[in-house]
Amino acid sequence: MQRHVAILGAGPIGLDAALACADAGWPFTVYEAADTVAAHLRAWGHVRLFTPWDLNVSHRMRARLPDTPTGDGCPTGAELATRLLDPVAALPALEGRIRYRTRVAAIARTGLLKHEQIGTGTRATAPFTLLLDTPDGEAIAEADLVLDCTGTYSHPNTLGPGGIPAPGERALADRITRTLPNTEESDRWAGTVLLVGAGKSAQTAARDLAGLPGTRVEWVVRKPAPDWGAVPDDTLPGRQHLVDTSRALADGANDRVAVHTGAYIQALSPESDRIRVALATEGGPHEISCDHVVALTGYTGDASLYRQLQVHECYATGAPMNVSAALLGSAGGDCLTQPAVGIDALRNPEPHFFILGAKSYGRLNTFLLRTGYQQIDQFVAAYADAPRLLSTGT
């Protein structure tokens, strides 16, 4: 049986990896848990990116879709999905290669446990076994090389101190919004919204919710003196605008927005059709009764997929160790200045297994699509002379 390259996830990086495999003549299959490509992008489709079209389209996509928009205009998530990624998925080179509604539940080396054959050729040549959840039930697939491009957006962080769930959070999980709210549905957010987080997603939500006349925002920020991720002489106007707006809200520019800095969630409890939230603040305990809770405290990838593989994770970021070391050692936190870490940093102790895209950055929030496309370039270059491996597993 001819084995394939397994690509997990049909987002921008997974689709670019598929094009790279098609260009190289390597057999491949893309496994996508949703019923469409770019499911994560569509989940925040109403939000406009900071980065322009030219930073969000790979050279492989551009070569096959020359009419894709160019220039400094910044697309929304929905525009990126419908004007770029849907046409990519419809290309003849990808026909029949994407298996929708098929989630990879776990990955292992066929016949080997995690601790066996460490660093040996035996382990390197054993195929991967993928456990699949499909519309028809569980199934098994094999591959010689696996690219995990599953992203992070479906695995949000929790609200409690130190990153664990706050008491009551799990019981109220179905009443907590963990994605960017769409404020075009203004009635949906009437009343008091408790917003938690200080990153760009939370800043976007604060800006948009503050514009709704029927909404009051109680914004909880962990740091006592947040810098809002300001970048000196920022060249991305949309990002700078968010910083300016957040500073203004923290300074009291909108009387329907209260910003609680140096605060964190202690507990949540139901209060009839509302939620009571206990806060720890610099001034002492504080309670808020709210109609909605929006938790935007970041996202991390699902590491359980490769629990049985030999993956060396950074103890601080959760990213692959070599990637994390390269990024943490670079100067500055601007996504536009992050280095291309190189193929050696992308490799794992598990041969032929790569974590690419936003998931490769772990808890670091400086990933750009451009970086993911560079990762695909590095992967292709490293395997350019290995067609026999990819087609026969030897």
State where each predicted segment sits.
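E1/E1-like adenylate-forming module used to activate ubiquitin-like modifiers
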Residues: 149, 153, 295-358
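A Rossmann-like FAD-binding core segment of flavoenzymes
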Residues: 106, 211-314, 381-394
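Glycine-rich dinucleotide-binding loop and its adjacent helix/turn
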Residues: 77, 148-212, 217, 317-327, ...
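Conserved Rossmann-like nucleotide-cofactor binding loop
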Residues: 13, 36, 153, 201, ...
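A conserved FAD-binding loop/helix module that cradles the flavin
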Residues: 341-393
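N-terminal Rossmann-like FAD-binding beta1-loop-alpha1 element of flavoenzymes
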Residues: 3-30, 195-198, 202-212
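Glycine-rich active-site loop/strand segments that organize a redox cofactor
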Residues: 34-84, 179-181, 219-238, 351, ...
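Feature captures the FAD/FMN-dependent oxidoreductase FAD-binding
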Residues: 70-145, 150-155, 266-277, 289-292
